[in-house]
């Protein structure tokens, strides 16, 4: 019983901590929902539809979009 109470309190604390330290730039949840709504209207804008760069293709070192996330000297490995 005590362990259950401790676990519940820990989960509540971590949830509150997550919301307290979350990056709330701009409108917070309102901004998130409007972005999701835009992605539903325009499926091509969704990040899930972006193709990853295959091994041996050119990539960006700063923001790699390689399928395995390894970009060395402008090439995915």
From Swiss-Prot:
Coiled-coil intervals, chain numbering: none
InterPro entries to which the protein is assigned, alphabetical: Conotoxin
Family to which this protein belongs: Belongs to the conotoxin O1 superfamily.
Free-text note on domains in this protein's UniProt record: The presence of a 'disulfide through disulfide knot' structurally defines this protein as a knottin. The cysteine framework is VI/VII (C-C-CC-C-C).
Prosequence residues removed at maturation: 23-50
GO cellular component: extracellular region; host cell presynaptic membrane
Disulfide bonding pattern of the chain: 52-67, 59-71, 66-76
An annotated Gene Ontology molecular function: ion channel inhibitor activity
SUPFAM superfamilies: omega toxin-like
Tissue specificity annotation: Expressed by the venom duct.
Signal sequence range: 1-22
The protein's role, per its UniProt record: Omega-conotoxins act at presynaptic membranes, they bind and block voltage-gated calcium channels (Cav).
Protein name: Omega-conotoxin-like Ai6.2
